[in-house]
Every structure is written in structure tokens, then in C-alpha cells.
Amino acid sequence: MVSYLTTEMKAGELRSRRSAMLLLSQESCVTLKRRGDLKEERDRGYIHIYTGTGKGKTTAAIGLAIRALGAGKRVLFAQFMKTADFSEHRLLKTLDGLDLLTFGKPFFIASEDHREGAAQIDAQPVFFFAKGEPPSFYREWVKDGLREVEERLQGYALIVLDEILVALSFGLTTEEEIVALLQKTKVGQDILLTGRNASSGLIALADVVTEMVERKHYYRQGVRARVGIDE
């Protein structure tokens, strides 16, 4: 009796396994049928956003650019709101397949006390302006940068607009201008936007959104930016 029950139980287990195998087989067939569609989706190109208060947005963008280069793809890396004094420029401008553009100097600061005009801070040129009223020449720099990127879109698999979201949050460009550029990209082109304060409209439009969150940073203890680590 015990032997009979054991045999029946084993037979039941076998039937269950066969049913599971049949189901997996059917799912595999569906997967194979869809593989072509998935490949088309994979290769169509996507909009990425790296945002948030945490460190690492530009660093991650550089990593993505290097990965693209390693796969034999061409990269257009456009930096807004930055000068060419950052350490990574020494390497990026030497990489075959990557074109580096820099738009954005001198630095500027939104002043709460209505202080305006040019100044020097740590031997760097700085332009103060009233909060909510960014200098018109800086708007033109950003607009010229977006125009140059648009003119050079052809032939790149990855386009990086580094710190363009900061430019947007300062009122140096508009969401409409950025969307107009996104609409000019072709099938197979990925475009990455970086910077703090990503707008809700661009987040809704993007396919991949990554937010860097600062939990702790030594600059809050008075440690200044370190060459080779922070700049």
C-alpha cells in the first residue's frame, strides 16, 4: 500500500513536471517569436536622465561614453555650465571616436542681495546676477551650444548633454528647446541629459531616469573639491 501511494505520488510529480516543461516550452516559443520585435526596440535609441543632488552624474555619463566607445560607437559629449579645466578633459579629448564640446564660462552665481557684475573667486572669473534674471549672454551661449549639437547629430550613436538640466533650472534654456533637439535624433541614437533638478516634463519623456542621492559628503565638513576626484 505504501509502495502504491509512493508510486502514485511520483507519477503525479512527473505529470506536474511535464506540465511545467510544456508551459516553459510554449513560453520559449513566444519569446523566440518576439525576439525580432525586442531587437528592434533595443536598437531604436533611448532618452536617459542622470539627475539628483548626489555626486556622480558626470562621472556616470563618462562611464557610459567609454562603454559606447568600447563597442565601436561614436560619442558626442557636450558639456554645459562647465569650463575645460576639469581633469577629465585631458583624457576625453584624446579618445578616438569621441568629440568633446564645452559651453559655459565664466561661472555665474544667482545673487540674493542683488549683487551684479563680474568678479574673481579663487582666480576664476565669476559673474553675479539677480536671482531669476540670468545674464542674456549666457543664454546665448547655451542656445549656441544646443544649436551646434543639433548641427552635429549625424553619425553619433550616443549624445551626452552634460549639465543641460542645470542650465534649464537656471532659466538659460527652455524645456521646449531641449525637446526640439530630442526630436531631431534618429533611430539608433541614445541621448543622455545630466544635471540637478530635472523637470517633470523631461522625466516623463525619458526612458531611463537615474537619481543620485547625497547621503553624506565631506564638502559639508569644509573639504574643498579634490583634483582627480571631484574635478
Say what each PLM segment does.
Residues R35-G36, G145-G155:
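Short, charged beta->alpha transition segments
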Residues Y46-E150:
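Conserved P-loop
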Residues V160:
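Glycine-rich phosphate-binding loops of nucleotide-dependent enzymes
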